[in-house]
Amino acid sequence: MAIEESPTYAEPGPYEALSRFSSLTREDHRKWWEHTGPVLEKVLKDSGYELQSQYTYLYFVQQHLVPYLGTFPTRGEDEHRWQSNLTPYKVPYELSWNISNKVVRISWDPVCDASGTEADAFNKKAIHDCTRQIAQLSNTIVLDRYRILHQELVISDQEEQELLRRDDLPKSGRGQHNLAVDFQNGGIALKVYFYPYMKFLATGSPVEQLFFAAIEKIGTADIQEPVKMLRCFLSPSFDDGKPSVDQKVFPSLLACDLCDPSKSRIKYYVIDKWVKWERIASLWTIGGRRLEDPSCAKGLALLKELWDLLAIPEGDRGDIWPNLVLGQPPTHLMTTMANYTLSPASRFPEPQVYLTTFGMNDMAIMDALTAFYERAGLTDMAKSYKKNVQSYYPNLDLSQTNWVHEAISFSYRNSKPYLSVYYSPF
C-alpha cells in the first residue's frame, strides 16, 4: 500500500500570517497595511530582529498605527486627505533606519476622520486617543511632558476659531504634532514632536520664545547650562560674546521622549535655509562654543567626510516646504536641519545634523552611503545596503528616482558615528 506524503508548504512570514485574520475592515486601513507591512518586515529582518520581534512590531503597526493614518494617498487626489507636515509629499507616515545600531523607527502624524474638516480643522483630536492607547501598552511610557508641551504649543479652541476667521491662513501646514516610535530591545520608545507655526500665527509670540517658555514649564533645573548655551547661539539678544545665527536659521520643532521625566531628553530643532558646509560646521560646533568638547572635532571630521561623499549642492533654499504633488518628482532641493539634545548628561547641547538629500539621485546617494559605511567600519551594511533598499521599492528604478532618500542624520556618540536614513513612503 502506497503511503501518501503530507503536502509541503512554505511557512508564512510575519506579514502574511498577520494579514490572514486581520481585523482591519476599512479599505484605507487595509491599503496602508498592504503598503507599509511588507517593507517593514524586510527592514526588520535586514536589521537582524528576531522572528518574535518581527511579529511584535508588525502587530503593533497593524493594530495601533495604521488606524491613525487616515485616507490612503492616491495620485491626483491630494486634496482629499490630510496634508501632514511630516514628509515632503505631506504623507503622515515615515520609516527611518538607524544604520549604526540597526534600529528601526516609524514616525507618523495621527489622523482621524475629522482631521482637516470643520470638526477638527487643525487635526488636534487624533493624537490624544493615539497616545493614550499606546501608553496602555507599556508602563515605561509616561505622558507628563506630552501634556505640558501640548498645553504650551498647540492652539486652544479659542485661538483655533480666531485663526479660521483669517483670510491669510494657509491651507497646508496646519498640523501641530507627530509621534515616533523606536523598535528596540523588544519594547517601544515613544517620542512626540510639536510644530509651532499655528501657535505663532495665533499668538504673535516668536517661535523661539514659545519653545524656551515650554522648556521652562517642563523644568530646567538640571539642564540650565546647555539651555543657556543654545539660547545664546540662536538669539542675538542673549549675547555671550560668541557668534549667533542669522535670520536664515530658525526654530522648527520641539520634541521629547515620553518616558520617565528624569530620563526624558528634550530636542530643539532648527532649519537653515542656506545650505553650505561652513554653516553646517557652525551648527555642529554651536558657533564655536562646543570646540572644547573632545568629541566635537572627531565628529566634525566624519561629518565632513559624509558631506563630501553626498556632494549636496550648496545654495539658498528659498522655499523651505515646496508645494509638491504626490507622484511628481521634486524639481528642487531642500534645507539643512539640526536638532540639539538638552540633557543632564552633557553641559553642551548635543547636535544632530540632517543632510537633506530629497531631490537628489537615489543611486548616487546609495553609492555615497556605501562608501561612508566602508570608511566607518560598517562592512556588512556596506555590502548589503543597495540591494536591501532596492528590495523595499521593487517597482522603482532607483537610478532614475530622486525622492526615496529624504535625509541622512548624523551625530557622534560614544566615540562612533550615529547615522540614520529617512525614506519616502512612496
UniProtKB/Swiss-Prot annotation:
<dbReference type="GO" id="GO:0004659">
    <property type="term" value="F:prenyltransferase activity"/>
</dbReference>
<dbReference type="GO" id="GO:0009820">
    <property type="term" value="P:alkaloid metabolic process"/>
</dbReference>
<feature type="binding site">
    <location>
        <position position="191"/>
    </location>
    <ligand>
        <name>dimethylallyl diphosphate</name>
    </ligand>
</feature>
<comment type="function">
    <text>Prenyltransferase; part of the gene cluster that mediates the biosynthesis of notoamide, a fungal indole alkaloid that belongs to a family of natural products containing a characteristic bicyclo[2.2.2]diazaoctane core. The first step of notoamide biosynthesis involves coupling of L-proline and L-tryptophan by the bimodular NRPS notE', to produce cyclo-L-tryptophan-L-proline called brevianamide F.</text>
</comment>
<dbReference type="InterPro" id="IPR017795">
    <property type="entry name" value="Aro_prenylTrfase_DMATS"/>
</dbReference>
<feature type="binding site">
    <location>
        <position position="105"/>
    </location>
    <ligand>
        <name>dimethylallyl diphosphate</name>
    </ligand>
</feature>
<feature type="binding site">
    <location>
        <position position="267"/>
    </location>
    <ligand>
        <name>dimethylallyl diphosphate</name>
    </ligand>
</feature>
<comment type="similarity">
    <text>Belongs to the tryptophan dimethylallyltransferase family.</text>
</comment>
<protein>
    <recommendedName>
        <fullName>6-Hydroxy-7-prenyldeoxybrevianamide E synthase notC'</fullName>
        <ecNumber>2.5.1.-</ecNumber>
    </recommendedName>
</protein>
<dbReference type="InterPro" id="IPR012148">
    <property type="entry name" value="DMATS-type_fun"/>
</dbReference>
<feature type="binding site">
    <location>
        <position position="422"/>
    </location>
    <ligand>
        <name>dimethylallyl diphosphate</name>
    </ligand>
</feature>
<keyword id="KW-0808">Transferase</keyword>
<feature type="binding site">
    <location>
        <position position="352"/>
    </location>
    <ligand>
        <name>dimethylallyl diphosphate</name>
    </ligand>
</feature>
<feature type="binding site">
    <location>
        <position position="354"/>
    </location>
    <ligand>
        <name>dimethylallyl diphosphate</name>
    </ligand>
</feature>
<feature type="binding site">
    <location>
        <position position="94"/>
    </location>
    <ligand>
        <name>substrate</name>
    </ligand>
</feature>
<dbReference type="Pfam" id="PF11991">
    <property type="entry name" value="Trp_DMAT"/>
</dbReference>
<keyword id="KW-0637">Prenyltransferase</keyword>
<comment type="pathway">
    <text>Alkaloid biosynthesis.</text>
</comment>
<dbReference type="InterPro" id="IPR033964">
    <property type="entry name" value="Aro_prenylTrfase"/>
</dbReference>
<feature type="binding site">
    <location>
        <position position="193"/>
    </location>
    <ligand>
        <name>dimethylallyl diphosphate</name>
    </ligand>
</feature>
<feature type="binding site">
    <location>
        <position position="269"/>
    </location>
    <ligand>
        <name>dimethylallyl diphosphate</name>
    </ligand>
</feature>
<feature type="binding site">
    <location>
        <position position="418"/>
    </location>
    <ligand>
        <name>dimethylallyl diphosphate</name>
    </ligand>
</feature>
<keyword id="KW-0017">Alkaloid metabolism</keyword>
<feature type="binding site">
    <location>
        <position position="195"/>
    </location>
    <ligand>
        <name>substrate</name>
    </ligand>
</feature>
